Amino acid sequence: MTAPEQTFRNKKQRKQQVKLRKPGFAVAKYVRMSPRKVRLVVDVIRGKSVQDAEDLLRFIPRSASEPVAKVLNSAKANALHNDEMLEDRLFVKEAYVDAGPTLKRLIPRARGSANIIKKRTSHITIIVAEKGNK
């Protein structure tokens, strides 16, 4: 087993290093929505310009479009404010949805049995970048 290229003293340093590698990104964690349903919306905006993605999200008739729009807006603001990118050149470089923890609830059924209802959560990540930059 090889040693890692760079070691970190604590979790905070590791998180700061991740932020340095991914300019213009935003994450929404524990969104109370199924990842499968959120992915349908995220797949539409991947690779589009930020302005086009905002317009699309405004008119997509799915409830997942609201949290995705909030994350996109946050990523755009981070890119403009923290990384000093130009708004006209921004596009959605990466957009993905990971499954968060699942809340399990019991529903009583006949003869003393019960069914489990899985209330799924999602982690939405969007990374924006300038066109021409990799």
Swiss-Prot record:
One Gene Ontology CC term in the entry: cytosolic large ribosomal subunit
Keywords: Ribonucleoprotein, Ribosomal protein, RNA-binding, rRNA-binding
Annotated InterPro entries: Ribosomal_uL22, Ribosomal_uL22_bac/chlpt-type, Ribosomal_uL22_bac/org-type, Ribosomal_uL22_CS, Ribosomal_uL22_sf
UniProt entry tagged with the keyword RNA-binding: yes
Matches recorded under Pfam families: Ribosomal_L22
GO term, biological process aspect, one: translation
A GO MF term: rRNA binding
Segments crossing the lipid bilayer: none
Domain of life: Bacteria
Keyword RNA-binding included in the entry's annotation: yes
Functional description taken from the UniProt entry: This protein binds specifically to 23S rRNA; its binding is stimulated by other ribosomal proteins, e.g. L4, L17, and L20. It is important during the early stages of 50S assembly. It makes multiple contacts with different domains of the 23S rRNA in the assembled 50S subunit and ribosome. The globular domain of the protein is located by the polypeptide exit tunnel on the outside of the subunit while an extended beta-hairpin forms part of the wall of the tunnel. Forms a pair of 'tweezers' with L32 that hold together two different domains of the 23S rRNA. Interacts with the tunnel-blocking modified macrolide azithromycin. Upon binding of the macrolide troleadomycin to the ribosome, the tip of the beta-hairpin is displaced, which severely restricts the tunnel.
Family membership: Belongs to the universal ribosomal protein uL22 family.
Complex and partners: Part of the 50S ribosomal subunit. Contacts protein L32.
Name this polypeptide is given: Large ribosomal subunit protein uL22
Underlying gene: rplV
